[in-house]
Every structure is written in C-alpha cells, then in structure tokens.
Amino acid sequence: MTTMRGWILAGLLLAAVVAQAGEMHALEVEARLRDYFFDAARRGDQAMLKEFVEAGFDLDVQDAKGYTALILAAYHGHGGAVEQLLEAGADPCVQDARGNTALMGAIFKGEVRIARRLIGAQCSPDQRNGAGQTAAMYAALFKREELLQALSARGADLGARDALGNSVESLRRGELNGTAAAK
C-alpha cells in the first residue's frame, strides 16, 4: 500500500512539474507573440499586423512601458498601420505608463497626418498624461499650430494648465514653468 501511495505521489508530482513546464512554455510563447506584435507595429508591417488582427490578438495589450501597438505605430510614423489598427478596434485613448497617448506621441514626433487622424478618434481632447499635459499642450510646445487649431475645433480646453502651471498659451510662447524655453 505504501509503495502504491509513493507511486501515486510521484506521478502527481511529475504531472505538476509537466503542467508547470507547459504553463511556462505557454507564457514564453505569449511573451514572444507580444514582442512580434510590437515589432510589427514599430516597423509598420501591415501584413504581420493583419495576421494578429485575424487571429483575434488583443490589440490593446501593453508592453512594460505601457506602449500599445497603436502608440508604437503612431510614434514611428506608420500611418497605414495606425489606420489598420484603428479599423480593427484598437483603442486610441489607451495611455502608456506615463499617461501619454498615441496622439501625444504623433504630435511629439511631428507626424501631422497621423495626429489629425487620431484627433478624429473618440477620445477626450483634454485627456491628460501623468504630468497633467494635454495633446493641445504638446501641439503648442512643439509648434504644431494646425494641430492646435484642430484640437480647439474638437473642444480642447486651451486654458488648461499642467501640474507645473504651464498653459497652452505659455507653451506656445516658449515659456516653460515661467522661464523661456530654448529656441
């Protein structure tokens, strides 16, 4: 009887180890798939993104910095990939670990066409990042006047202030927290 229990216990332990190894393998596979997904967005590889979309992959999955495929595609200037991800249901309002959105990244990088598309998304034009900054503040700071006008037309609060007291108007003038910004 004791030998039988020993064999059963050994079998259960072996099954647990195998199951855990399978789970570890599944986690590794999932991590690699996320890496491939983010790399495809970073490169603007629409064929690869299409495979992920058709497979039902979570389009709003985030990496360690909180970046989504949409944030990466916008930041790297891949308008076709941005459009593809939006049409497939990616959420343009998702914020990274610092609270920045795909729109903020596009404005920062000067991707005007992509930013215009994202301004048309159903996100609040006054969505704030972790520093209290809005997309309009980014547009003012980086001298993207046409985007600032588009955000204003969407109802952005141009009188808002960030955590340091900067406003759209002060940023437009190159003033950061009461000091002149380097020009």
Region annotations inferred by a language model:
Residues M48, G80-A81, R113-I114, E146-L147, ...:
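Conserved ankyrin/ankyrin-like repeat signature
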Residues A140-K183:
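Leucine-rich solenoid repeat scaffolds
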